[in-house]
């Protein structure tokens, strides 16, 4: 019989681990210490308690209302540009924790309006797990969220909510949904929102959450948008233009706004029926439009652009692309090509035993293996006229998944030669990172 292990649903402190930090932090940096400080308050000394009260809980007349300024740092976006991320002050992170505690159900409600979103919170992440081969799927630090399909199986929840759809955009291009859309519709068009998070007007969360009938039945809903606005601004020096880039809570903030933009767009296309005459799918701020012909996709693009402008957001016309079947974008072509390279690479020195278990094959020249893979990626990028940055996230994700499966193996009872094989396999993968 499967072993059931309870994960406390009432443990809102886990928000501090999953929702308030950027994913792109050094691997040695986490909020585990912050979480432990909160959990150890009952046994802490008076001095420790006073520090936590002042620096985390924000207790005191001067700290309760004062906004905080995030620590800003940059990560590489591509060969020329950088992306600026925000590390929120602990007091602001605690305010986010309290907001989740009060409004978790309303967050789910406002993230359920759009049929177009392919990355949206669906439910509170699993309250229990069964001992099985999938329990460690989220053990290691990644940029993923908990998918609804694995909810109830995963031991290490990477997000407070379980999500419907895809945790990575590239998975959409290889999904059944994408292939079904290609069967049904002749034309595809892409829409990119210009400088999305930097351009979001924080007060627009109130515009997106004003539902009179729902608010009448749920009195606290009337203050949801206002409070979310205050919480986000508190961690960003009280700025109303732009939201902190990096934390998952910012993606949820934007998701609620975009759900309303999706809904307005569908309502304004009165002469067309969604999921019959056209469909669009949205991953955060990337929109993919599908329709019978190009004239309809352009009509939908124009309508969606108008909906964006009502929230002070704008489509980036320079990045718009249109194509007819077969739908092979530069991005999807890269992913398909990289997927082939990755599979050939791993099959040359790893054997899949099923149930998530990988066994290393004999490796005679780690450098030769690594170089062959690197050369194949070079050729792919050269043929597609792109930099490594375009497929870096896909490659890192693929390699990370294999490393996780290898290190989950119990090698304590294995012979020394077999153990050496595991180390060699991991060395090969680190060589190409």
Where are these regions (language model features)?
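Short, surface-exposed, charged/polar-biased interaction segments
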Residues: 117-124, 212-218, 222, 270, ...
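Short, surface-exposed helix-loop/turn micro-motifs enriched in polar/charged residues
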Residues: 84, 275-279, 314
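Generic structural signal of hydrophobic/aromatic residues within well-ordered alpha-helices
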Residues: 34, 38, 47-55, 96, ...
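Conserved two-metal-ion catalytic palm core of "right-hand" nucleic acid polymerases
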Residues: 1-245
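Conserved polymerase palm-domain catalytic core
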Residues: 180-284, 289-298, 349-433
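Polymerase palm active-site segment centered on the conserved acidic dipeptide of motif C
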Residues: 294-372
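Short aromatic/hydrophobic-glycine micro-motifs
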Residues: 105, 270-274, 313
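Amphipathic alpha-helical segments that form well-ordered structural scaffolds
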Residues: 95-102, 204, 256-264, 303, ...
């Amino acid at each position: 019989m499967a072993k059931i292990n309870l994960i406390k649903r009432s443990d809102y402190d886990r928000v501090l681990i999953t929702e308030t930090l950027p994913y792109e932090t050094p691997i040695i940096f986490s909020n585990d210490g912050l979480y432990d400080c909160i959990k150890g308050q009952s046994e802490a000394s008076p001095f420790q308690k006073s520090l936590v009260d002042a620096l985390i809980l924000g207790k005191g007349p001067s700290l309760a209302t004062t906004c905080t300024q995030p620590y800003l740092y940059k990560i590489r976006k591509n060969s020329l540009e950088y992306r600026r991320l925000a590390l929120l002050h602990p007091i602001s992170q605690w305010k986010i924790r309290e907001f989740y505690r009060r409004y978790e159900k309303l967050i789910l409600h406002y993230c359920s309006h759009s049929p177009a979103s392919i990355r949206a919170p669906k439910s509170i992440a699993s309250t229990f797990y069964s001992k099985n081969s999938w329990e460690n799927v989220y053990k290691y630090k990644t940029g993923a969220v908990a998918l609804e399909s694995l909810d109830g199986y995963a031991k290490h929840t990477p997000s407070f909510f379980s999500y419907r759809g895809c945790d990575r955009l590239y998975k959409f291009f290889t999904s059944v949904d994408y292939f079904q859309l290609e069967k049904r519709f002749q034309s595809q068009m892409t829409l990119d929102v210009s400088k999305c998070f930097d351009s979001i007007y924080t007060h627009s969360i109130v515009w997106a959450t004003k539902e009179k009938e729902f608010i009448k039945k749920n009195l606290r809903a009337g203050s949801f948008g206002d409070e979310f606005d205050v919480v986000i601004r508190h961690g960003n020096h009280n700025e109303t233009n732009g939201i902190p880039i990096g934390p998952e809570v910012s993606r949820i903030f934007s998701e609620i706004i975009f759900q309303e933009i999706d809904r307005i767009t569908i309502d304004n296309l009165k002469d067309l029926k969604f999921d019959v005459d056209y469909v669009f799918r949205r991953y955060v701020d990337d929109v993919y439009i599908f329709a019978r012909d190009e004239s309809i996709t352009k009509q939908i693009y124009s309508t969606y652009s108008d909906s964006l402008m009502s929230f002070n957001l704008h489509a980036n016309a320079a990045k718009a692309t249109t194509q007819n079947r077969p739908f092979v974008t530069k991005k999807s072509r890269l992913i398909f090509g990289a997927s082939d390279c990755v599979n050939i690479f791993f099959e040359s020195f790893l054997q899949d035993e099923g149930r998530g278990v990988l066994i290393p094959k004999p490796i005679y020249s780690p450098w030769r293996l690594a170089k062959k893979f690197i050369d194949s990626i070079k050729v792919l990028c050269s043929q597609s006229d792109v930099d490594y940055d375009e497929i870096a996230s896909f490659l890192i994700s693929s390699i990370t998944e294999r490393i996780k499966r290898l290190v989950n193996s119990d090698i304590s009872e294995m012979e020394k030669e077999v153990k050496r094989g595991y180390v060699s396999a991991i060395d090969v993968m680190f060589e190409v990172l």
